């Protein structure tokens, strides 16, 4: 499969249980269930969790994402932001890393600012705290995009500065 080739290319060791480990990670990302509640068929939850964290810390998931979107259809690009409520204990102990959790009316939230190609496939994203406005994050997101024929966005991105940036690009 395409994903398997990318994983091996990104120096992820091809262990016997690689497929089920990755399936377990993807299942957890799709459903949002706690790691412990994944079906047992995906293997030991703690082992899968530790691998996921190690790959994330090493930037391997981001590299996999970039390889999966190697040839986006840039005729139309859609950008928008969406909130995700963070767990009540997510703002626990202080960390040196930015966890992208902010305070908003809904409590602790994160926000994904996403750009999609003409087929609706994600091509670029930024994750911020939930209190970050779409129009303040748009310049960063747009600057990462290859040239697009048309960029479509909702009124949260309506500003002269963003229009000028899109026209320059």
Question: Model-derived features: where do they sit?
Answer:
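Short alpha-helical elements
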Residues: 1-169
């Amino acid at each position: 499969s395409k994903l398997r080739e990318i994983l091996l290319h990104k120096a992820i060791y091809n262990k016997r249980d690689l497929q089920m480990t990755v399936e377990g990670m993807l299942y957890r990302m799709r459903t949002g269930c706690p790691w412990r509640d994944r079906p047992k068929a995906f293997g030991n939850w703690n082992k899968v969790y530790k691998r996921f964290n190690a790959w994330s810390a090493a930037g391997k998931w981001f590299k996999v994402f970039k390889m999966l979107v190697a040839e986006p259809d840039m005729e139309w690009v859609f950008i928008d932001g969406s909130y995700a409520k963070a767990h009540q204990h997510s703002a626990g102990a202080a960390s040196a890393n930015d966890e992208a959790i902010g305070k908003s009316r809904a409590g602790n939230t994160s926000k994904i600012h996403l750009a999609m190609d003409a087929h609706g496939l994600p091509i670029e994203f930024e994750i911020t705290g939930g209190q970050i406005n779409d129009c303040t994050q748009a310049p960063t997101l747009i600057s990462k995009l290859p040239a697009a024929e048309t960029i479509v966005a909702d009124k949260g991105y309506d500003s002269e500065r963003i229009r000028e940036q899109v026209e320059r690009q």
